[in-house]
Amino acid sequence: MTTHAPFRVDHVGSYLRPKDLVEARAKFANGEITREKLTAVEDKEIRELVKKQIAAGLKGVTDGEFRRAYWHLDFFWGFNGIEHRVGKHGLKFNGVETKADTATLTAPIDGHNHPFVEHFKFLRDLVKDEDVIVKFTIPSPSQFYFELIFTPENIAAWTSVYPTEKELFEAIKNAYVDVITDLYNEGLRTLQFDDCTWGALADDGFIKRFDADRPLEEVRRDFVGRALQLNNSVLGVLPKDLVVNTHVCRGNFQSTWIAQGGYEKVEDELLAGEYVNAYYLEYDTDRAGDFKPLAKVSDGKKVVLGLLTSKFADLEDKDEVIARIKEASQYVPLENLYLSTQCGFASTEEGNILTEEDQWKKIALISEIAQEVSGK
């Protein structure tokens, strides 16, 4: 068996939260149950989820992000020096707004004793006798940086601790290396950086929000350079036998989106320059553009085409998906192409607008298509 992701039948990582878990999290938030009781429910539901993933033929299993409210913020809150705060408003998606939670830097940061290490160890022990590996997902370093600069309040907070951006970057790098080293020492060999910054940087509207006074492309190049520098500063010092892949999307909250724009605007940095093994790329709608930027993918790197949507229940036409895979093979060799949904089924605890049965039908369709394309 291949010992790391991607796999021919693959997924991004998050799954719809079961009813019992949703209820337990609500009770914990209201002070009705203890942390220990919530953890017991989480453990139970993760065990069931792993069984379902294995039954569906997935070889890289996750915990569904069942211990998180958000795909990214819970990880940030695990750093020493970061506080969970509530801002003035949430992120405005297409027709809906998230809760106003944020991560604010209030003291020098480090990644020692990060709670996600225990999350990994539970999953590791759960599958130790199975013919699968653990794929562990965390937000990218660049995603952390963009959280810290997204509001004036967060900017004021970090600049009171780190006088320069150079010092902040070094602190972020070291904090990430702290956590990843601990994960590696506990046995992790496949890590996934989830990263919405590239999708935002491909969107002209987002670029204008970062800096409306300078020329748009000048601002884009500036921030794209920062994202690449920060991610590679971490990737470049990790153990060689730790496989790190990255997932790029344009927002996934209650079946809506937040950004649009093709990869051509970030292709040199993302597809040619980032030190990752594989790219999980959103491609379920025209908002992601065409396949031409894939020509920039470095030799030997793998691309997981997110051609099926995790946002809605309707199943894609198998022949159309196969035709798109063949189209993409003009730019990346077919043996280096893989298939998944464009994102997870529940990037936040609210989840997308489909049922648990629907999400497994999507995985089954991925399996069917992958077998037909590979001939196995």
Predicted segment positions?
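Domain-level signal for soluble alpha/beta catalytic cores
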Residues: 1-376
